[in-house]
């Protein structure tokens, strides 16, 4: 009975870790599929006119003007003796509907992403509150693992993590990650420039604070590895 309890005590933190990693993703994916049809119907029924912010409205007007010019140019290239205004208006109307549908789909995806992010945050918060004992066990295991590493290996792991998160080759990964949450081009470009830099500064501050607490010699070793890199 004692062995069974000890085995259960060892496996419970791993099950808890797997649940906080995969459970929010599974549930948010389920809610996203369930909410998609409801959000689409709500937007189509409750909103008689599309709601656009200033940036979206400006972008839509620019695309509409560009579309109008392209259709007019297409009619001129055909060398028609007389421009068919009725056909031209029909073409403009069809393309305008497509543009509005595109912006409507963008709004739907924005609402779904925001909703699923809130759901994931709530699930993680509940798991953190209910699994306080498992968190303590995991924290003790991580501290013991880090304590048993040599100073050189600790510095190497920190340097590898720094390069993995903030290296010059990670720009595309940050663009993909931020683009999956933020769909506005201007906001995405701003966050791609600012977010990694701010996170990098916080990470460096935490790293040197941690190294000073663990072993001051690690700071010198880490600095030397950074200079070599």
Curated annotation (Swiss-Prot):
It is a multi-pass membrane protein. It catalyses: K(+)(in) + H(+)(out) = K(+)(out) + H(+)(in). Signal peptide: none annotated. It comes from the Eukaryota. GO terms for biological process: potassium ion transport. One of its GO terms (molecular function) is proton transmembrane transporter activity. Keywords: Antiport, Chloroplast, Hydrogen ion transport, Ion transport, Membrane, Plastid, Plastid inner membrane, Potassium, Potassium transport, Transmembrane, Transmembrane helix, Transport. The chain crosses the membrane at residues 11-31, 118-138, 158-178, 190-210. One of its GO terms (cellular component) is chloroplast inner membrane. Its main location: plastid. It is found in: Plastid, Chloroplast inner membrane. The keyword NAD does not apply. Belongs to the CemA family. Contributes to K(+)/H(+) antiport activity by supporting proton efflux to control proton extrusion and homeostasis in chloroplasts in a light-dependent manner to modulate photosynthesis. Prevents excessive induction of non-photochemical quenching (NPQ) under continuous-light conditions. Indirectly promotes efficient inorganic carbon uptake into chloroplasts. This is Potassium/proton antiporter CemA. It comes from Pelargonium hortorum (Common geranium).
